[in-house]
């Protein structure tokens, strides 16, 4: 049986696991229970009523966090010819063609996101076993297979994230840092909810939203009232 540390026990006592919290209260608790010695990431863990083994029930899309992620993201780009130089000028941390593919095959993985142009995807397919398990394989649905490298790099650097449901139908999306203001966290959280709603697959049956939890990296899980979050209208929202 796993023994909880005194610290985690004390944090868990601040959260009633039987209570589904209003969004504002949940964020208040998130900040209260984040007391590690580093700026913890604010995380969402969302269980959906889908069965990802069926193609028409898979969830994979992107979300733009309007207040950013709070993290510097390292972007690698695979392209050909002038597109490599275009990516470098646009702010890619590393860009290349066949030589970069060979480096990755040799173990180079110092990047958080991979973007590729469509014409090099047949070669990128060789990296499937390396990139796939890490969630780094470029995909059109995720906005990471594109000829618009400048736009894609700018968006992902600014706070765009790719997400997908895992094999159990759970989506895990970071939505900032606990040092963010409550207003910034709420803006990002609302964007996550909107993105999940837009990504609802055609084959989803019954109740789409099952549970919606947030937590800090080292903190306890806090369940949010998803209906209250969906009904929430933020200032400046259309």
Swiss-Prot record:
Task of the protein: Binds directly to 23S rRNA. The L1 stalk is quite mobile in the ribosome, and is involved in E site tRNA release.
Annotated keywords: Repressor, Ribonucleoprotein, Ribosomal protein, RNA-binding, rRNA-binding, Translation regulation, tRNA-binding
Gene of this entry: rplA
Keyword Ribosomal protein: yes
GO biological process entries: regulation of translation; translation
NCBIfam families the record matches: rplA_bact
Name the UniProt record assigns to this protein: Large ribosomal subunit protein uL1
Oligomeric form and interacting partners: Part of the 50S ribosomal subunit.
GO MF, one example: tRNA binding
Entry's Gene Ontology cellular component terms: large ribosomal subunit
Annotated Pfam families: Ribosomal_L1
Family: Belongs to the universal ribosomal protein uL1 family.
């Amino acid at each position: 049986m796993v023994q909880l540390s005194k610290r985690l026990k004390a944090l868990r006592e601040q959260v009633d696991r039987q209570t589904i919290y209003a969004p504002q209260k949940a964020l208040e608790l998130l900040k209260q229970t984040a007391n590690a010695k580093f700026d913890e990431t604010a995380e969402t863990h969302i269980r959906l009523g889908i069965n990802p083994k069926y193609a028409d029930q898979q969830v994979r899309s992107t979300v733009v966090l309007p207040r950013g992620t709070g993290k510097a993201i390292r972007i690698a780009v695979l392209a050909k010819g002038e597109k490599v130089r275009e990516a470098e000028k646009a702010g890619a941390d590393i860009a290349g063609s066949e030589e970069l593919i060979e480096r990755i095959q040799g173990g180079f993985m110092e990047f958080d996101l991979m973007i590729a142009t469509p014409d090099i995807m047949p070669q990128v397919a060789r990296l499937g076993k390396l990139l796939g398990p890490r969630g780094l394989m470029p995909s059109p649905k995720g906005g990471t297979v594109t000829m618009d490298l400048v736009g894609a790099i700018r968006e992902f650097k600014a706070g765009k994230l790719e997400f997908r449901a895992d094999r159990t139908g759970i989506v895990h999306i970071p939505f900032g840092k606990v040092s963010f203001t409550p207003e910034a966290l709420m803006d990002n959280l609302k964007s996550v909810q909107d993105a999940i709603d837009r990504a609802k697959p055609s084959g989803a049956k019954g109740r789409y939203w099952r549970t919606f939890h947030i937590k800090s990296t080292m903190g306890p899980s806090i369940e949010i009232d998803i209906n209250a979050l969906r009904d929430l209208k933020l200032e400046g929202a259309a």
